[in-house]
Curated annotation (Swiss-Prot):
Gene3D superfamilies: 3.90.1150.170, Type I PLP-dependent aspartate aminotransferase-like (Major domain) (3.40.640.10). The gene is ddc. InterPro entries: PyrdxlP-dep_de-COase, PyrdxlP-dep_Trfase, PyrdxlP-dep_Trfase_major, Pyridoxal-P_BS. Coiled coil: none annotated. PROSITE patterns: DDC_GAD_HDC_YDC. Belongs to the group II decarboxylase family. GO terms for biological process: carboxylic acid metabolic process. Its EC number is 4.1.1.86. The modification N6-(pyridoxal phosphate)lysine is found at residue 319. Pathway: Amine and polyamine biosynthesis; 1,3-diaminopropane biosynthesis; 1,3-diaminopropane from L-aspartate 4-semialdehyde: step 2/2. This is L-2,4-diaminobutyrate decarboxylase. Its cofactor is pyridoxal 5'-phosphate. Keywords: Decarboxylase, Lyase, Pyridoxal phosphate. One of its GO terms (cellular component) is cytoplasm.
Length: 510
């Protein structure tokens, strides 16, 4: 027999008991988060081995109920999670979040709107369109509706290279009737499969290669060019590469420029890249997933000069905009280029709806069902105002330059790349230490500090050198916070360096 009372209690609906349970459990959850925030330890989950033994999924026929399940998750998940707001959590583009973003998440989750069709998110659809228009004006595209919120940079970059490829093939290939070739209708011409190329720098985000492979073009379709000493795309090498490809009969569909590379935070010379792509008739996509935050900067906006010249742009708001994951956007300069991915489904975006101006946003997205993540950015901008928001973004740039100066002046530390944005690449180099052990030393310093829950420092490569990385984007981290962290780094290196050199060291990750 169906127990509708229990069904109603389990759903978030207008049932009195459901509402009471929701209010009570949400109150308990907020209290638990508050307690977790006040614990000053960055991480208390232990090693991978310890976590693996502690975590167990426990389904049952009867269930354990809301309260018991919540208490179990407070201990199993919340208390074992990384505190991304902690001043020593600097490894990745993994930001602390705005209070308004967290409040917006409650509204997003409770209403459960879906952004594919207007009748599934009436207010949200119109709000997203307005926010896209505002973002377009901020980047310099001008007013318009060509753009959509996405899950993040990988999806936005996929949209950029997908549209660029199909635009390129339509421009350079004809079907049997002499019309521009439609990849959407007819697939990829065999000749185009071999000859269409996308260019990016050697430090571009891996999603460029990954997306081209998913599009059926393979890694072979991506040509990388070197970077200069500032980790920016070498524009002389770019021009030589494009000339060489053209001479070979290849067609460059797109050049992906980066505004804020993942490791160095490098911003490529956007205006010069646009000049070169214009010369060869190629699309220019800018991956500004990180550096795009500077469109709100009070001080450093000029670092993005030329962004307005691009054909498409990736923005991520769950990086330097301090929004909860996930929240990104794709902006398209010329709305006509959406034709390469347009698909009409009678039950979502019918011709009738389009004739009457109904904003069914599925037409602009690779996703169908999609969260109203735009609400987080909307509420943050309206509540903070652009000046305060810009100040919070600018802090990371200023802090990074101060940290770089400190590293250069500190014995035992070496700055590997002069920073541009909000990332510091450095390493520990003890005086007289055997060079063959320096990479291992730096790797294990980071691993040791994380295993004890004291710091989360990134590990990457600069050329062939093992590098430590601090992504200094937090608007509340101070120079003194970072100095204290660097003192821990040096102390840890001193503690383990002899064991590493003698071969007696046991890595904490084992």
């Amino acid at each position: 027999m169906v127990d509708f009372a229990e069904h109603r209690k389990a759903l978030l609906c207008n049932d009195a008991q459901s509402i009471a349970d929701y209010e009570s459990a949400m109150g308990e959850a907020v209290k638990a988060v508050s307690a977790w925030l006040q614990n000053e330890k960055m991480y208390t989950g232990g090693s991978i081995k310890e976590l693996r033994s502690a975590i167990s999924f426990q389904p049952s026929k009867e269930g354990m109920g809301v309260q018991q399940s919540l208490q179990r998750m407070i201990e199993l998940f919340l208390n074992k999670s990384l505190k991304v707001h902690h001043p020593h959590s600097l490894a990745h583009l993994h930001c602390p979040t705005m209070v308004m973003s967290q409040i917006a998440e409650v509204l997003i989750n409770a209403t459960n709107q879906s952004m594919d069709s207007w009748d599934q998110s009436p207010a949200g659809s119109l709000m997203e369109v307005q926010l896209i228009d505002w973002l377009r004006q901020k980047v310099g595209y001008g007013s318009g509706q060509a753009g959509v919120f996405t899950s993040g940079g990988t999806q936005s970059n996929l949209m950029g290279v997908l549209l660029a490829r199909d635009w390129c093939i339509a421009k350079n290939w004809k079907d049997e009737n002499g019309n521009p070739w439609s990849v959407q209708r007819d697939g990829i011409p065999a000749e185009a499969m071999k000859n269409v190329k996308v260019i990016c720098s050697e430090n571009a985000h891996f999603s460029v290669q990954k997306n081209m492979a998913m599009m059926g073009m393979g890694f072979q379709s991506v040509v990388t060019v070197p970077v200069n000493e500032n980790a920016q795309m070498d524009v002389d090498a770019l021009e030589k590469t494009m000339a060489h490809l053209q001479a070979e009969g290849k067609v460059v569909a797109c050049v992906v420029a980066t505004a804020g590379t993942t490791d160095a935070g490098a911003i490529h010379p956007l205006k010069k890249i646009r000049e070169i792509t214009n010369k060869y008739g190629s699309w220019m996509h800018i991956d500004a997933a990180w550096g795009g935050a500077l469109i709100l900067s009070n001080t450093y906006r000029a670092m993005l000069d030329g962004i307005e010249l691009s054909d498409s742009i990736t923005l991520d708001f769950h990086k330097h905009y301090f929004q909860s994951i996930s929240c990104g956007a794709f902006l398209l300069k010329d709305e006509a280029n959406y034709r390469f991915m347009h698909y009409e489904a009678e039950y979502l975006n019918s011709a009738y709806d389009e004739e009457h101006g109904v904003p069914n946003l599925v037409s602009k997205s690779l996703q169908t069902t999609r969260r109203f993540d735009a609400l987080k950015l909307w509420m943050t901008i309206e509540s903070l105002g652009e000046e305060l928001y810009g100040s919070m973004i600018d802090h990371g740039v200023k802090l990074t330059r101060e940290v770089a100066d400190y590293i250069k002046a500190t014995e035992g530390l070496e700055l590997l790349v002069e920073p541009q944005f909000a990332s510091v690449l450095f390493r520990v180099v003890p005086e007289g230490y055997p060079v063959e052990f320096i990479d291992s030393l730096n790797q294990n310093v980071a691993d040791e500090l994380f295993a004890r829950g004291e710091a989360n420092i990134g590990v990457t490569k600069v050329g062939n050198v093992q590098s430590l990385k601090m992504t200094t984007l937090s608007p509340v981290v101070t120079v003194d916070n970072v100095k204290n962290l660097l003192a821990q780094v040096l102390a840890e290196a001193e503690r383990i360096k002899d064991a590493i050199a003698s071969g007696n060291y046991v890595p904490p990750i084992d």
